[in-house]
Amino acid sequence: MKQQLLKQIKNIIMAANSNLKTLFNGIIKENPVFVLLLGMCPTLGTTSSAINGLGMGLATTFVLLSANIVISLLKNFIPDKVRIPAFIVVIATFVTLVEMIMQAYVPALYESLGLFIPLIVVNCIVLGRAEAFAAKNTVFKSMFDGLGMGLGFTMALTLLGSARELLGTGKVFSLMIFPENYGMLLFVLAPGAFIALAYLIAIFNKLKTSKN
């Protein structure tokens, strides 16, 4: 009896460690933006400000988490021939839900993000995790994978949005940091997105290398 209890505790600890590893992989080791370089369209297109980056990241996180859970639950019932269309239907359902919620409760952010919200449906991060992970793993593992990837994506977009807003307008989350007449318009425009992203990727990889 005692041995069985110890074995169960050991299994629980191992499962928890595995789930935490999956979670942190998405945030750091396999960060979708800074490491895998996925989702570049919303990354470059929505990060003109910190609030836009945060909003887009959280919307994508909700879709990632929800889609991973549902697809993992249904993986044994979806025929292999139609799995991609089925995944897209599941993802599109949650994207529509996010779109309706944002339109109702944060209309200014909804208007600012515009077409990028429905484009979450074809975001390669969301569909990629559904195909590569959720369709092959348990619900709990898929949940942690979706959460980790979503948080990693949110972190990247918020950092990029903050950097661009700070350098472009002297503000972060609309709070004045630098003098009022400060601002480099380049960083609010598309070329500034590429420059800021390149520097953040370099810094992120340098920190990872130093840690290793």
Regions found by a protein language model. Name each.
Residues 2-24, 208-212:
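Intrinsically disordered, low-complexity non-transmembrane regions of multi-pass membrane transporters
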Residues 21, 143-212:
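C-terminal transmembrane helix-loop-helix hairpin of multi-pass membrane proteins
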Residues 50-66, 86, 110-121, 191:
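Structural signature of hydrophobic alpha-helical transmembrane segments
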Residues 60, 64-101:
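A glycine-rich, hydrophobic loop/mini-helix early in the fold
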Residues 67-80, 127-137, 203-207:
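C-terminal ends of transmembrane helices
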Residues 78-91, 112-118, 142-145:
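Cytoplasmic-side transmembrane-helix entry/capping segments in multi-pass membrane proteins
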